[in-house]
């Protein structure tokens, strides 16, 4: 079965084609990727310091058809070769989701194909199955992105249990807001991680929120406030030397990243112990953070569990993960469509409510 996937939940337009045959034959899942196209809107939103929903929707309209053509050209396929269409149904920006839904449903109806709405987070959770070493069910998923920070137990396709989540800012959101405090460019997550590599460890004693809370929830708003307080103290010193200012920013970025990484790693290890799982999956945009990956690898080597990552290019939003998740859903549901004829979207959508019965 060849599935077309369309992702338009926020500021990336992604289109991909996935063939389920390798998965069904027990071969590495990544062998099923036939073609993909991806366009990021980062440059367009940079002047605004964040995503402008109206601009995002308009850009999705411009990009989705050329990306479909690009994916078909890569794969050597025609529209008539497609067996089903998957699209991001939610959560996300309403206007952006509507573009993908309308395009996908119109195409599916025109070609007389089934369509399936995919939960955006399910796409992220399953994307590590496309890596070189796929995890075994059940596994713990640490999902960290600009909008979500969650620990999930994944027992199979469509079998998800929330173990803990952020009570305020998501980790990716904290990265972006802190980067803005330090005067870094948008998007802030990658910028602050790069700056942290130049910083010295332990210069600032920043809090590690909820590290010893006893549960698996997170909170990062207080950490952002602590960074703000440090910047105010530094400003009051009236230091004007460029080298000193640059080192201050690097040291503060290092302490900030170290604090977030410490909390994420500790909670992940606790989730593994509580559930007895031996496999941990890191997914979402922050999953590309090299400091977090290094810390998880070190902890795994000392404590006897395995960590699995999606390919770096699949950490951010993309069409491959939607095509893949949609394909696995359709196999689990015996190729049934799960959407009506309407252009239905779910800007707010709890993943567990979409579990298979």
Swiss-Prot record:
Cofactor(s) in the UniProt record: Fe(2+)
GO annotations of cellular component type: cytoplasm
GO biological process: tRNA threonylcarbamoyladenosine modification
EC number of the protein: 2.3.1.234
Function text: Required for the formation of a threonylcarbamoyl group on adenosine at position 37 (t(6)A37) in tRNAs that read codons beginning with adenine. Is involved in the transfer of the threonylcarbamoyl moiety of threonylcarbamoyl-AMP (TC-AMP) to the N6 group of A37, together with TsaE and TsaB. TsaD likely plays a direct catalytic role in this reaction.
Database matches in NCBIfam families: gcp_kae1 (TIGR00329), T6A_TsaD_YgjD (TIGR03723)
Name recorded for this polypeptide: tRNA N6-adenosine threonylcarbamoyltransferase
Originating organism: Polynucleobacter asymbioticus (strain DSM 18221 / CIP 109841 / QLW-P1DMWA-1) (Polynucleobacter necessarius subsp. asymbioticus)
